[in-house]
Regions:
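Active-site-adjacent elements of ketosynthase-type condensing enzymes
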Residues: 108, 112-118, 176-180, 258-285, ...
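Phosphate/pyrophosphate-binding loops at sites that engage ATP/ADP/AMP, CoA/4′-phosphopantetheine
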Residues: 150-163, 311-319, 349-365, 387, ...
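ACP-dependent fatty acid/polyketide chain-elongation machinery
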Residues: 39-43, 47-48, 55-132, 154, ...
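Compositionally biased, intrinsically disordered low-complexity segments enriched in Pro/Arg/Gln/His
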Residues: 9-16
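Conserved beta-ketoacyl condensing-enzyme motif
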Residues: 73, 94-227, 256-265, 360-376
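Glycine-/small-residue-rich "gating" segment that lines the acyl/pantetheine channel
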Residues: 190-196, 234-237, 241, 250, ...
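Condensing-enzyme catalytic core mediating Claisen C-C bond formation in acyl metabolism
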Residues: 70-74, 101, 279-356, 365, ...
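Active-site-proximal alpha-helical scaffold in enzymes
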Residues: 143-156, 205-209, 213-257, 295-317, ...
Length: 479
């Protein structure tokens, strides 16, 4: 099955460096003393006791504070409007580049919004054969491509390092294969026989997870998170929980969105949440700026390979970061407007920190939801202050969406990528286009230029339509 995931060369820049394996504990046997056979049983018991103590020490070393298994990230794959790999995406983030431009997928000249964060130069045929291409939606093509990169980068061999049924998939999406449903409806108007018989299954939200599972031979847990803009974040946290609880040893996890079409763009425009700065696409997404006027709709996918620390260490895997905890809450307020008190966002962050077994004072970076809407940015700022108190002013906060736009169900996983790489490299990605700060948004948003900072523990936020809130705590991996 692994061969099916090796159809394209792995980018040299992403080949993981092998880490030296830790020294294994060796048992120390003592002989009988002075031929005193009568104490042999006692000596044997002492040896057994030492072995038990060593096993217990090793178990504690590989266990989180709350008694569950530790979960680490060993591979990351990315297809975004910034690039077609982890390295391309990360380099663009550090450089503060925008992935926003004019819509090219269709003629948007009649719409009030004509800009988006499109994936550029993606060739699905490199990852999926022609027969499957006709039967699947673009969202699945992008997901499979990102999953293959994550799998290759991890160095994991399913079927050798872990059994097929101990590897699962949790993918998040908001829109799924929405465009396939539209295409089927258009064909139906011509005649029922014109419809693609695979259109409906291709449009299902769980289709991306299915195709990752099929291509990579992951026969364990298969789950799909449909939680609007919080989908990608929650999927990573849910996958980590499966490993912690012993339901899996490794998981593919992430978020995907690949629906930039006429109805999606028109629909969000009617909600008045999109930026109409068509003349300046790269400067259109302006989180925390007083001149912000909405987000830019975009697409993308990030998939991460999660493993139990025991499995990752056992095979000498390269480790990017550790997943510590997840917090999920509901505003129970309005499907399209966040609770003005910010209480839902506060609960998500607090519960994530509690689940991680750390304290608020341990957190030294926040990757914000930062959607650049009129209501979200001051509310998120308020929520961060409520969670961290006066210390909030000392914590750097940045919005990846300033560069990527809002990729809906994929946004959380893209921002998790940024957070993981910030933890690993000590470089914080900037909030670009922040030139005139909103007085209500008065935190340190890492404006316009990346910054070096030796962070250890970070929170990444995703707050979505339907009052869906998800926060995840990630940490630098320490031996």
């Amino acid at each position: 099955m692994r061969d099916e995931c090796l159809r394209i060369p792995h980018p040299s820049s992403l080949i993981p460096q092998k880490m030296s394996r830790g020294k294994r504990f060796s048992s120390m046997m003592r002989g009988s003393i002075g031929g005193m056979r009568r104490v042999a049983g006692y000596a044997t018991n002492k040896v057994r006791a030492r072995r038990v103590r060593k096993r217990e020490e090793r178990s504690r070393e590989l266990t989180r504070v709350n008694g569950a298994r530790r979960v680490v990230i060993t591979g990351i794959g990315a297809i975004t409007c910034l690039g077609l790999s982890l390295q391309e995406t990360w380099d663009a983030m550090v450089a503060g580049k925008s992935g926003i431009g004019p819509v090219t997928r269709f003629d948007a000249s009649h719409l009030p919004v004509r800009i988006a964060g499109e994936i550029k130069g993606f060739d699905a045929s490199k990852y999926i054969d022609q027969k499957e291409l006709r039967r699947t939606a673009r969202v699945s093509h992008v997901a499979v491509a990102a999953a293959q990169e994550a799998y290759l980068a991890s160095g994991l061999e399913i079927g050798k390092d872990v059994q097929h049924d101990r590897v699962g998939v949790v993918m998040g999406t908001a829109m799924g294969g929405f465009e396939m449903s539209e295409s089927a409806l258009a064909d139906l108007r011509i005649g029922p026989r014109k419809m693609n018989p695979f259109a409906l299954p291709a449009a299902l939200p769980n289709a991306p997870g299915h195709h990752i599972s099929k291509v990579c031979g992951a026969k364990g847990v298969l789950s799909t998170v449909v939680a609007a803009c919080a989908s990608g974040t929650q999927s990573i946290g849910d996958a980590a929980e499966m490993i912690r609880r012993g339901k899996a040893d490794a998981m593919f996890a992430g978020g995907v969105e690949a629906v930039i079409n006429e109805s999606a763009l028109a629909g969000f425009a009617l909600m008045r949440v999109l930026s109409t700065n068509n003349e300046n696409p790269e400067g259109a997404q302006r989180p925390f700026d007083i001149t912000r006027n909405g987000f830019v709709y975009s697409e993308g996918c990030v998939v991460m390979m999660l493993e139990s620390l025991e499995v990752a260490r056992g095979r000498g895997a390269h480790i990017y970061a550790e997943v510590l905890g997840l917090g999920v809450s509901s505003d129970a307020y309005h499907i399209a407007i966040p609770d003005p008190t910010g209480s839902g966002a506060v609960r998500a962050m607090q519960w994530a920190i509690e689940d991680a077994g750390v304290r608020p004072e341990d957190v030294d970076y926040v990757n914000a939801h930062g959607s650049a809407t009129e209501t979200n940015d001051p509310l998120e700022t308020k929520a961060i202050k409520l969670v961290f108190g006066e210390r909030a002013y000392d914590i750097p906060v940045s919005s990846t969406k300033s560069m990527t736009g809002h990729a809906m169900g994929a946004s959380g996983s893209i921002e998790a990528l940024a957070t993981v790489m910030s933890l690993k490299t000590g470089i914080l990605t900037p909030t670009i286009n922040l030139n005139t700060p909103d007085p209500e948004c008065d935190l340190d948003y890492v404006p316009n230029v990346a910054r070096k900072d030796d962070i250890q523990v970070a929170v990444s936020n995703s707050f979505g339509l339907g009052g869906q809130n998800a926060s995840i705590v990630l940490a630098r991996y320490e031996e």
